[in-house]
């Protein structure tokens, strides 16, 4: 009888635990057809769908003087959202506005290449609050 009770208690303690989903690693690079004229800030943002709305789940800022920029970002399962992930990168110079942008949908792959498209005002774009 004590064995049956011990067996029942062990089942209750163990339960139906499932291992957590592993973190997802997104590896990629940011490129641009034009060279950088000075040190730039590059923000790589990841967006996910939450409650029917697209929301930023992670942003990483890099500072570089050369492209391509190689990156590796780790997303934990809570950051994954309800479906597809989207990536956006922006390039800006200190004290200036956004100079170039790239966007891409992440579809079942962890390796991405974001090709920055310079704005027509590159490399002299101003942000609205620095004029």
From Swiss-Prot:
Residues 1-15 form the signal peptide. Coiled coil: none annotated. It is a lipid-anchor. Gene3D superfamilies: 2.60.40.2990. Its main location: membrane. InterPro entries: Pilotin, T3SS_Pilotin. A lipid is attached at residue 16 (S-diacylglycerol cysteine). One of its GO terms (cellular component) is cell outer membrane. Keywords: Cell outer membrane, Lipoprotein, Membrane, Palmitate, Plasmid, Signal, Virulence. It is found in: Cell outer membrane. Disruption phenotype: In mutant, only a small amount of YscC/SctC is properly targeted to the outer membrane. Mutant is Ca(2+) independent for growth at 37 degrees Celsius and secretes smaller amounts of Yop proteins. Changing residue 121 to S: No change in activity. A lipid is attached at residue 16 (N-palmitoyl cysteine). Interacts with YscC/SctC. Involved in the synthesis of the type III secretion system (T3SS), also called injectisome, which is used to inject bacterial effector proteins into eukaryotic host cells. Pilot protein that is required for the proper localization of the secretin YscC/SctC in the outer membrane. Also required for efficient oligomerization of YscC/SctC and stabilization of the oligomers. Belongs to the ExsB/YscW family. This is Type 3 secretion system pilotin. It comes from Yersinia enterocolitica. The lineage of its organism: Bacteria, Pseudomonadati, Pseudomonadota, Gammaproteobacteria, Enterobacterales. The gene is yscW.
């Amino acid at each position: 009888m004590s064995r049956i009770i011990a067996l029942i208690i062990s089942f209750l303690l163990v339960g139906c635990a499932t291992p957590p989903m592993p973190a997802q690693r997104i590896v990629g690079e940011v490129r641009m057809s034009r060279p950088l004229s000075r040190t730039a800030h590059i923000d790589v943002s990841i967006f996910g769908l939450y409650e029917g709305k697209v929301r930023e789940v992670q942003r990483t800022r890099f500072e570089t003087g050369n492209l391509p920029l190689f990156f590796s970002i780790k997303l934990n399962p809570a950051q994954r959202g309800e479906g597809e992930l989207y990536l956006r990168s922006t390039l800006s110079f200190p004290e200036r506005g956004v100079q170039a942008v790239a966007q891409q949908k992440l579809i079942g792959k962890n390796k991405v290449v974001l090709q920055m498209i310079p704005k027509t005002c590159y490399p002299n774009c101003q942000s609205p609050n620095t004029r």
